[in-house]
Amino acid sequence: MSIQIYKPNKTNSGFAFSFYMGENLKDKIPSLFINAISQHSWDDKRKIGSFSGSKSDPEKNISIKFNHFECGSIISAINNRFEWNTYHAYEDNKTQIKLSPWDKVITNTKINSKTKESYEEKTTIPAFGIVITRNGNQVFKIPLEPGEIECIKILCKSIISKYCDVTSSANRNQEKSKDNISSDYEF
């Protein structure tokens, strides 16, 4: 499962995020990966943003790996609407990751069934935002709509479920190996 979210804008300050499950080749333990890239350009005629020009600039993109416990924390933060922070250090990079809830006001157009007139109604919906800050000055951020955050939550649940399956299978195989080994000692 892979989730791609692109949010370019005309001020050329948008970002694209990718969320996906990867696994360790040796033991098949799954992890959540988040890749983020800064918007490179904006085509005002076509009203579309491009990210590909930032691909080769290491300061314009980032990749982060999360374990199953961090996936559990993400799910808990989403379900209980609290801010979740974590810190990763790799080589010379120090990275702060923050998932924050916020209330987004949207406007819906509705039709009055009696008068057949349209009217607008404001509604507050639960949204989230992710901000990733590397080395204090490289910032990657994206707002997340309710549907997007639900998909991320399902991806995190899938990773935890697969982790449980893999480790349970490994434990069963280990037990079978112990049964096949004869020993003069009992433990």
Would you name each region that the model predicts?
Residues 27-53:
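A short, structured beta-strand/loop element
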Residues 19, 30-39, 126-132:
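Short, hydrophobic/proline-enriched secondary-structure or compact coil segments at domain edges
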Residues 131-187:
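Mixed-charge, glycine-accented linear interaction segment located at domain edges/termini
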Residues 43-64, 134-142:
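A cross-kingdom feature marking solvent-exposed beta-strand/loop segments within repeated
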Residues 21-28, 64-68, 120-124, 137-150:
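Short, low-complexity cationic-aromatic patches
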Residues 3-6, 12-14, 23-27:
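N-terminal intrinsically disordered, cationic/polar leader segments
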Residues 85-130:
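Intrinsic, low-complexity N-terminal interaction/targeting segments
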Residues 50-55, 62-88:
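Compact, well-ordered interaction domains used in eukaryotic information-processing assemblies
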